[in-house]
């Protein structure tokens, strides 16, 4: 136990440059790479971040469909735009109807617009 404590004390007293040199010497002696160990250790965290679910969505009107008037009415109700602005948005599709909404609201808006006859995408 005393030997281990001496090693800990010796390692604690090393400067950063000495610790880097020690790491190089150990890599050569053991035939390993510290960079590979760091990459392997970081991989699970990166995978967890990739799985993280998107929290903000943009409801995109891809196409008005056959019931353009119904879609215009629904766009007006959702956005609060005037008749001309809503008509321009619908006729200018693909356009964003609402941005920065959560998943639940985005799904609700998508369902409303699709019920009116529009083709909708969530981004």
UniProtKB/Swiss-Prot annotation:
GO cellular component: cytosolic large ribosomal subunit
Keywords per UniProt: Ribonucleoprotein, Ribosomal protein
GO terms, molecular function: mRNA binding; structural constituent of ribosome
Listed Pfam families: Ribosomal_L12 (PF00542), Ribosomal_L12_N (PF16320)
Signal peptide: none
One BP term from GO: translation
Superkingdom assignment: Bacteria
Record InterPro entries: Ribosomal_bL12, Ribosomal_bL12_C, Ribosomal_bL12_C/ClpS-like, Ribosomal_bL12_oligo, Ribosomal_bL12_oligo_N_sf
Role summary: Forms part of the ribosomal stalk which helps the ribosome interact with GTP-bound translation factors. Is thus essential for accurate translation.
Subunit structure, interactors included: Homodimer. Part of the ribosomal stalk of the 50S ribosomal subunit. Forms a multimeric L10(L12)X complex, where L10 forms an elongated spine to which 2 to 4 L12 dimers bind in a sequential fashion. Binds GTP-bound translation factors.
Recorded family membership: Belongs to the bacterial ribosomal protein bL12 family.
Descriptive protein name: Large ribosomal subunit protein bL12
Organism: Rhodopseudomonas palustris (strain HaA2)
Record gene name: rplL
């Amino acid at each position: 136990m005393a030997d281990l404590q001496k090693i800990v004390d010796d390692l604690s007293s090393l400067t950063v440059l000495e610790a880097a040199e020690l790491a190089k010497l150990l890599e050569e002696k053991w035939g390993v790479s510290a960079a590979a160990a760091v990459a392997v250790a970081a991989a699970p965290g990166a995978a967890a971040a990739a799985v993280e679910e998107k929290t903000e969505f943009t409801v995109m009107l891809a196409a008005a469909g056959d019931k353009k008037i119904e879609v215009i009415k629904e766009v007006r109700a959702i956005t609060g735009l005037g008749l001309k602005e809503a008509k321009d948005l619908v006729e200018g599709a693909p356009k964003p109807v609402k941005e920065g909404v959560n998943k639940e609201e985005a799904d609700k808006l998508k369902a409303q617009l699709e019920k009116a006859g529009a083709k909708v995408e969530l981004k």
